[in-house]
């Protein structure tokens, strides 16, 4: 989702934006309602979405993409590249806090990468316990 949100932000700043995804669909890690909203925002912002493509190389003023569906390479003229890849857990802050405070919980992507709906639910459940 982060890459999609960055694409929307940059497009709304007046940039022409390509959103390149290796998977067959944009926003597969989000819930249905979030995905519908996301796709509407990207459409309104005129973000050009390319699915089933892999980044092969970044040149000074272009990028080369390889289609994952057919034996075809595409070259796009660009000015800037923003790369948003995957999710990695980071619980460093939790480790510092757990010994200094009672009722410290590790949640969301800090615990392990997951879909946003699961992370939000987990946050709600932990907050409910703390009330």
Residue ranges and their predicted role:
Residues 2-3, 46:
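Intrinsically disordered, low-complexity Ser/Thr/Pro-rich tracts
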Residues 3-9, 25-35, 92, 98-101, ...:
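A conserved FAD-binding loop/helix module that cradles the flavin
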